[in-house]
Amino acid sequence: MRIRAGIVLIQNKKVALIERHRAGLDYFVFPGGGVDEGETPEQAAIREAMEELGVEVAIQQKVAEVKVGLKSRHIYFLVEQTGGEFGTGIGEEYTDSDSYSPDEGIYIPIWMPIEELAHHQNVYPADIARLVIKSVREGWMEVSLFEEL
């Protein structure tokens, strides 16, 4: 089963997202990526925060798991920025790496006001966007479980 680690980084009533433009589609995703062999989901989340956002983070808590069909599980962590500069990602999608293809689209790190999350139908996973809205109002509870087909 493929495991993906994602982060929820909130500052000043805004959440960090990656704005994507790919194959004529415009959408937003929570930062994250695949867990490499020998790596824990927590380690992957920390690595992905640096690669995609340019920030160092500390894990606060696991907030959600999303089962995607039979082949993938996404784990999301609430994180706190401890260093780095937002928008200075070092991942291959931001550099002239030979292994990155422009066909993979454009990645732009952004801060989206949390009150705007509810008005965007193109934030993925939508369950995590709804969880952020609810949890900012009511507080973070135990791990939420979601399933996507």
Give a label for each model feature.
Residues N12-K14, R22-G24, K71:
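Short strand-connecting beta-turns/loops that link adjacent beta-strands
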